[in-house]
């Protein structure tokens, strides 16, 4: 079954079946703007993957539009209706502008209700039948009264969706410490849990302020080279281990996997640096 990946605001991606070929003058292409079926109404997005690539990405998704494992056949419930027109794109652009006022109004209402939550982003569905409000909070929030209030203001179905710090960064985008676009917003499919042990294994600073991203969480990129460090460290003696060498008993103070060197300290307190080959000879 053909599957097409479509991107919406905030890097949100879902999967759809294409319309019958007879309904399209030309085949769908990447970045085509399309009108799609959603649970209640229609929305506008842009094509980001086609063919086998889209099928594999859909099969890998967990808890998303497919909700299936990688080895299972993907199940897609909605379809692409048609290509978007210039009028459709103008409508979408007007909604993006209107969302700024929606966010300000929602923040005012949150303060009125004294709720412990931060409004991150708002997203109108293209046909204005639904308004999704994304927020972060340290705990569960009872926002039922807020939803009723907002529904009265905007005269549409309101969905409040709590997201995590990394999901917020994915929606809002930004520039990382490296000076490039955030990985989570550009190419990284999903953020994996990151712990200080990853930084420790790579010999990085354990100060969270130096290894955290704009979201306030540890950098996703700590995963990228971790496997390399783990494999390389297997070639070296553990730091703190006492070895019997040609100089007698010496303790491993530090290792340098790039220069392939080991720093040793003897029982007499003298320190020397030897190559890994020399140590293993």
Locate each region found by the language model.
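Glycine-centered tight beta-turn/hairpin loop motif at sheet-sheet or coil-to-beta transitions
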Residues: 11, 245-248, 267-269
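Hydrophobic/basic alpha-helical segments enriched in Actinobacteria
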Residues: 39-40, 112, 167-169, 222, ...
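General beta-strand recognition
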Residues: 132, 251, 261-263
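Basic/aromatic-rich interaction segments and small domains that mediate binding to polyanionic partners
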Residues: 256-273
């Amino acid at each position: 079954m053909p599957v097409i990946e479509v991107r919406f605001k905030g890097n949100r991606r879902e999967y759809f079946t294409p319309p019958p070929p007879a309904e399209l003058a030309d085949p769908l292409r990447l970045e085509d703007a399309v009108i799609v079926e959603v649970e209640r109404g229609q929305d506008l997005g842009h094509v980001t993957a086609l063919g086998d690539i889209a099928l594999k990405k859909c099969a890998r998704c967990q808890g998303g539009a497919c909700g299936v494992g990688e080895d299972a056949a993907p199940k897609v419930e909605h379809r692409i209706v048609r290509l978007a027109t210039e009028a459709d794109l103008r409508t979408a652009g007007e909604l993006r502008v209107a969302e700024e006022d929606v966010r300000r109004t929602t923040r005012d209402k949150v303060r009125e209700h004294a709720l412990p939550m931060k409004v991150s982003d708002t997203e109108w569905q293209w046909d204005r039948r639904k308004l999704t409000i994304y927020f972060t909070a340290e705990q569960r929030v009872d926002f039922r009264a807020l939803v009723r209030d907002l529904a009265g203001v905007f005269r549409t179905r309101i969905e409040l969706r709590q997201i995590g710090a990394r999901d917020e960064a994915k929606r809002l985008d930004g520039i990382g410490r490296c000076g490039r676009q955030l990985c989570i917003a550009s190419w990284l499919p999903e953020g994996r849990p990151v712990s200080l042990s990853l930084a420790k294994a790579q010999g990085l600073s354990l100060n969270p302020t130096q290894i955290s991203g704009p979201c306030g969480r540890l950098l996703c990129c700590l995963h990228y080279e971790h496997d390399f460090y783990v494999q390389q460290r297997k070639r070296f003696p553990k730091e703190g281990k006492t070895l019997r060498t040609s100089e007698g008993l010496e303790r491993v103070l530090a290792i340098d996997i790039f220069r392939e060197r080991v720093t040793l300290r003897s029982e007499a307190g003298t320190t020397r640096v030897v190559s890994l080959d020399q140590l293993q000879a």
